[in-house]
Each structure stands twice: as C-alpha cells, then as structure tokens.
Amino acid sequence: RVEIHVASLNYGETARLMRPRYQLEQAQHLARVLRAVDDNVHVVYVSPFELPEDVVDYYRRLLSLGEAGSGDPAETPRQSRIGRGARNPFGETSDDVLPGGAFTVVVPELSDRFPSSAPLAQVCLCSPACVKRLRYLAHSGKASPVLIPGVSSGWAEKQLALLLNTPLLGPDPDVSSLYSTRSGAKRVLHAADINIPSGAHDIYDEEDLIIALAKLIAGRLDVQRWRFATDSDNGKSGRAFLHVENLEVV
C-alpha cells in the first residue's frame, strides 16, 4: 500500500492568519512516516517546506531499529528501509520507487511562493511538478494508493485525489464541514439518543445566545459555572466561562 499523507489543516482564512506558526503546525504530522514500520506500507509524506537532513535521518534510523543486525542505532540503516528520494523529491529514477517499509518526503516546488497561511493541499494543487511526482509514486507499482488528509478533508484534498486518481481516506468535504464542529457532533449525539451534558448548540447570534443561556441557568440552578466554546476553537482559544454567582438576576 502506498499512503500519500497531505497533512493540511483546513482552518478558515481568519483562523489561519491569526496563527503565526500555521505552516509549522502543518509539519507536526511528520511522525506519520513511522507508519512505514509495516513492511507492506510505503509512506509518501508531503511537507510544507524543506526538512533538515538531520530530521529525516532521525526518522530513518527509527525505522531501521526493526532491522536485523547489531541493534546499534548508529549503524547505517539498510537502503531498503529508507526513502532515497527524499533529498531530490522530483527526480524520477528507479531508486525513487521504494519497497514497503520506507518513506519518501515530497516538497511542493512552489511552496516558497505562497504565504505561510496557505493550506498545504492548495499549494500542492498549484505545483504541477509535485502533482506529477505524487501520481508517479502512487501508480508506479502494483501497490494500492490512498490519500490521507490532515485533520479533515476539504475541497483541495478532494480535487487532489481526483488528479491523482487515488481514493481519499475521509468523509466528503461537505459532510466533514457539517459534522466536524461542536454543533455537528451534538447533532449526531442527539440523533443517536445518547445522554450528554446540558448545553446548547447551533447558536449563531447574540440573541440566540442570551435566550439559550437564560433557559439553561433557570433550568439547572445547581450548575454554578457554564463554559462557552466556539464551534471550531482552533488552538483552544475560543473558550470562556461564566460564574452564575456573579449574576444579579436571570
């Protein structure tokens, strides 16, 4: 199996612009290359920027620990377990078609021309050499390819999967955007008739918030503190608390 990991974080534009380390956060999924510990899996990891060689070597050596040998981590790993195409992601030599138990790092050739707030999947779509390279790695052998997105799939991941003629592991973007929020999760739990804590969801303006909060406080006088959370508080920043004892009247 060939796993193409495009760990794009599909936050809204405002949320992305407010995250100065957004590009680095997209690269935090690098540990996915360790899925290549399975000899039947070859991992193609798409990185938003060029990775330092010592970082790539670190993961290569982690994978090499499962090899037969002296067990010394300093021992050079066997070539069959590493991605020799990592330093030259667009070269199409026979060495780039790697067996299972290995990984290849691919960097979109136009990544440095996009702002740091650009989602990785969109950068891939605008990088023709990267798309060509991913298609080559996905279909050069008999292994079954699959595209694995980041936190959730969006229109860019869907379009990329169509270009690569590769299945997308994840829900349809329309379904994902509908149920990946807190309100969406609440709707699913209510439909399944599962007991959940008291609360309100699908609140879209101040008037709805005040009415829902007044009903909750009046109906649960034993609750002394209520927590507010936005539907998608990326980075846990969209949270607040209300202490009922500070209210004079409800």
Language-model segment annotations:
Residues 1-180, 184:
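ATP-binding N-terminal substructure of ATP-dependent carboxylate-amine bond-forming enzymes
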Residues 172-250:
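Active-site nucleotide/adenylate-binding loops and adjacent lid/helix of ATP-dependent enzymes
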